[in-house]
Amino acid sequence: MGTVRPTLRGRRSGVLLIQVARTLGLGLILAGALSAAAAAQTVTVTARGQTAPVGTVADDAADDPAIWWNSRDPEKSLIVGTDKKAGLHVYRLSGESVHFTPAGRVNNVDLVDLGTQGVLVVASDRNDLAAARLKFYRLDTRKGALVPLGEASGGTGEAYGVCLAVLGRQIHAFSVLKDGGIVQVRLDRGRNKVTGTTVRNLRVPSQAEGCVVDNRTRTLYVGEERAGVWVFDARPDAPSEGRLAIRADGVQLVPDVEGLALAPEGQTGGWLVVSSQGDNAYALYRLPELAPAGRFRISGGELGSTEETDGIALALGRFGRTYPEGLFIAQDGDNAPAAQNFKLASWADILKAVRAGTP
């Protein structure tokens, strides 16, 4: 069979098709770039308060906060924060440290208000790098002090993160190990003592720390520092496999992935906030679909910015006139010339800035 040569019209059609394909391809690339730019748009809010510096100076020491909301007198709410070289501070909203509990190398902290049963506090104890421990306390809300309630095993390895879950009538703690292991511990609460029983083991592929549980949907979120955010079913009888639901893409979320916090809304909605440590920002994701919903930084003003944030905490509700819709707290990794501390921001300010800055 002889060679079939395209006519001039055919050649022109081919060129036109190539040009259209190139244009469409460029359009898709531009659309992707615009989507990434929209996801990565970062707004700024100003800190409205800060805590006193931790006691350990000239070192990476402040790490993780937890918030107790005083529903009867919101301005008397309390903050528990770790000095991971020395122990636990209890702060007022004014930033004053009202109590310090020596505990050595405690890394992360979480708490849950159990109503008439008191406020339970747990800290990840890494004093023994080969044997993680969970330390339990009761928060004396009148004195602003921590009362020891015992401890439990948090697994084999170095303790890093910890978060609490209310699953029906049971309280569970998730102990996140530095190597990516996650140990689920059911807590047994006596009158003046808390013990724990390991009920399940989970894992992410590499170093992890931050975690938070959505009690409404029984979902555990865990930050794998170089990869993103994993999602697990928090129920003790659920399958142990998780999924990498949010990737650290270097745009919306820049490694290291550190602290996680939730702002629940309705039955399944709200926001997940993630510390984007690599560019000193915080990434927002809309629940339940985990769609990117903006980014913000804490910067400017008399109190300065936050850098290299490890732990974060977020509690909704009125915390007085300064924090009318909720309180967001972030560890500040560079509070020079003073030691590291925690910065306080208004959740209302954050939402207003993010909504105004969304294309």
Features from the language model and the residues they span:
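Bacterial N-terminal signal peptides
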Residues: 19-33
